[in-house]
Design a protein with these regions (language model features):
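Iron-sulfur cluster-binding electron-transfer modules in prokaryotic oxidoreductases
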Residues: 1-288
């Protein structure tokens, strides 16, 4: 199965383990990832508050390249990239003058024919039906499915899942053998946009997320966003100072959990790249 793939910047940098796990499950399940050629950064910064035209030109060029290279849909694992590409599609569909201005900057034709899928949509569409027969090591743990902001908001643009109580990741985890908890912070912001400028706020926001998950019995927090993973995993010392207690709960990408359940190795899934060790029996069983 040949599927277009846009990694974005994070999957080649701070979230290499996400990239590795996406590629690994694809290989194991017969998916031929075809990376978009000549891709650029999607502009997932605060640029949209300074220069709207430029902030739309960057993701529009990606979409135009996908059309030019013959893709009808592309999988975008990074939630921030998924958000920016989807917002660009929405803005151009609803404002012809803006579309003309942006395409003048981009210098490529764009028809709006490419469908953008986040990683949860991809799993639901291409993997979910075959998944039960592929599981060799059920992920039998209590988990907190954390969606964050960018997969869901703005909801009028993304139209993905339920805004207040999304269920797509919960459904995937249940099939993998996990028990998703009911908790209050599954769509709260982790403070990713402030991860450099206001680490104190990141400590509070991310700390509240981990504290609630841990207090409700979760053994792991599951994410589908590189920014969320970086804050919840990498900022653990800041979080611990805010909470005044150590948080040892690991944070895994949904693709890593899927990979563990179908028998892939810790190396294939990039588990050693985490700041907080993944001390779960499934991870220990697949160290080879």
């Amino acid at each position: 199965m040949r599927i277009g793939f846009y990694p974005g910047c994070s999957l080649n940098g701070t979230s290499r383990e996400y990239n590795e796990s996406v590629k690994a499950i694809g290989k194991a399940l017969g998916i031929d990832w075809v990376e978009l050629k000549d891709w650029n950064c999607c502009g997932a910064t605060a640029a949209h508050s300074m220069n709207k035209e430029l902030s739309l030109a960057l993701p529009t060029r990606i979409l135009a390249l996908a059309e030019k290279q013959g893709f009808q849909e592309i999988v975008v694992p990074c939630a921030s990239c998924y958000n920016r590409l989807s917002v660009a599609q929405y803005e151009l569909e609803n404002n012809e003058k803006l579309k003309d201005d942006v395409l003048t900057v981009v210098g490529l034709p764009y028809l709006g024919t490419v469908k953008v899928l986040n990683v949860l949509q991809f799993i639901e569409k291409y993997i979910l039906d075959i998944l039960p027969d592929k599981i060799v090591r059920p992920f039998a743990h209590q988990v907190a499915c954390y969606y964050g902001c960018l997969l869901l908001r703005p909801h009028k643009v993304l139209k993905f899942d339920r805004l207040e109580d999304p269920q797509s990741m919960d459904k995937i985890m249940s099939i993998l053998g996990a028990n998703p908890i009911d908790w209050a912070f599954k769509t709260e912001c982790c403070g990713a946009g402030l991860s450099v400028s206001r680490t104190d706020l990141v400590g509070r926001l991310s700390g509240n997320i981990l504290k609630d998950a841990s207090d409700r019995g979760a053994e792991a927090v599951i994410v589908a966003c590189p920014m969320c993973h970086s804050n919840l995993d990498m900022r653990r010392s800041t979080i611990n100072r805010h909470l005044m207690e150590p948080m040892t709960i690991p944070v895994l990408y949904v693709t890593q959990v899927l990979g563990l359940a179908i028998g892939l190795s810790a190396k294939d899934l990039g588990l050693k790249r985490h700041f907080v060790g993944v001390n779960l029996k499934e991870a220990e069983l697949c160290q080879e």
